[in-house]
């Protein structure tokens, strides 16, 4: 059972509310709206706002009390924009260009079954780096993910970057199936907690699938301000929520 007092449920998106990069099912959407009648709900993801809308609906800011794209660097509360940070102002153009150039050079040397386009996506609060390219098809995405599980393509890439850019104040975080994020230290999903902790919640529950060390849910999952739950699929998320709140 849930702890007494005002509480908030924060959900990761991919692998938690939806299948990776897929739209939320009607059943899951309806369940969350019923859950919202009992507890405040919010979403926090690494993707930009447009991708969150693609997965959770154009009216996402009306369906959730909090919406935190890009780890909360872009923040909505009660349907209104709270703030928007940007990575270039924090890191400076020189470091960003060094990082982009190095990543492109590394990707050029990787031999994969397939490569597509959009290898680096520049977002407000991070760079998203994809060895296969974000424009790959769903079938190609799955093919890369299965290969990555065997050969640790992203993990090796990240380890190389950590050595090359040591001391530069950068965090490298693997999430989803085909990419990893690069952002300033402290700009992981914990960033969104700064927006909600002043709203008086006694308990902040967090649900995510990439909660292991190196995963992009790990920091917020282990943060003392949250009660974390690891899930493997949206069905897990629903089951745990039903046990806690229904």
UniProtKB/Swiss-Prot annotation:
Gene Ontology CC annotations of this record: cytosol
Catalysed reactions, as listed in the record: alpha-D-mannose 1-phosphate = D-mannose 6-phosphate
Residues that hold alpha-D-mannose 1-phosphate according to the record: 21, 123, 134, 141, 179, 181
Residues where Mg(2+) 1 binds: 12, 14, 209
Subcellular location: Cytoplasm
Residue numbers annotated as active site: 12 (nucleophile), 14 (proton donor/acceptor)
Keyword Magnesium: yes
Gene Ontology BP term (one): mannose metabolic process
SUPFAM superfamilies noted in UniProt: HAD-like
CDD domains (UniProt xref): HAD_PMM
Protein function: Involved in the synthesis of the GDP-mannose and dolichol-phosphate-mannose required for a number of critical mannosyl transfer reactions.
Record NCBIfam families: HAD-SF-IIB
Protein's name in the database: Phosphomannomutase 2
